[in-house]
Design a protein with these regions (language model features):
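Bacterial extracytoplasmic/cell-wall-associated proteins, especially those involved in peptidoglycan
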Residues: 1-173
Length: 173
């Protein structure tokens, strides 16, 4: 769980991991546990969705990003046809660089452009706000979003609307 930890030496990695797990267990309240149960997703799946939310936003639009993820997962014959197409997974695969078109061809189950559905597991530690967004996303009809020149996300119901927006943004041209 992302937090500030103090470790006195000599302790090993197992000690550090256990301390983080205990902290997560303290933050993972009965209410959150019930929401996970009610969601129909496993805790691993919720944490995977939460890490995607965490990595895709500065925090201002977590609920909308979570909504897009669920819309893509729950409507595999609409929008992106079940592919999440999350750039944060490409950044994980390429060592943290801005994703390129070539990165979309990296053969890995974490590549959400090549593989449908969720990646096998989280690749980052999501914060509590991202976990809450994964458990209670906004209700929208959005399947697409893009970061604009003003560094805020815009959301779209159709690929055509997103593509029109992208043509107006210098960062994509």
């Amino acid at each position: 769980y992302p937090d500030t930890y103090q470790f006195n030496t000599p302790h090993n990695a197992v000690y550090a991991i256990n301390k983080m797990l205990v902290n997560f267990d303290e933050k993972y309240t009965d209410d959150l546990r019930q929401k996970v149960t009610d969601s129909g997703y496993s805790i691993r799946e919720i944490l995977t969705i939460a890490f995607l939310v965490e990595r895709e936003t500065d925090g201002t639009d977590r609920g909308k990003i979570a909504s897009v993820i669920y819309n893509r997962l729950n409507n595999p014959s609409s929008g992106t046809m079940g592919y999440l197409q999350i750039d944060a997974t490409l950044a994980f695969l390429n060592g943290g660089k801005v994703p390129t078109e070539a990165d979309k061809a990296i053969d890995s189950p974490y590549n959400t452009y090549l593989y449908k559905g969720l990646p096998p597991a989280p690749i980052a530690n999501p914060g509590l706000d991202a976990i809450k967004a994964a458990l209670d996303p906004e209700k929208t009809g959005y399947f697409y979003y893009a970061l604009g020149d003003d560094n805020t996300h815009s959301f779209f119901k159709t690929l055509d609307a997103q593509q029109r927006f992208l043509r107006t943004q210098t960062r994509y041209n």
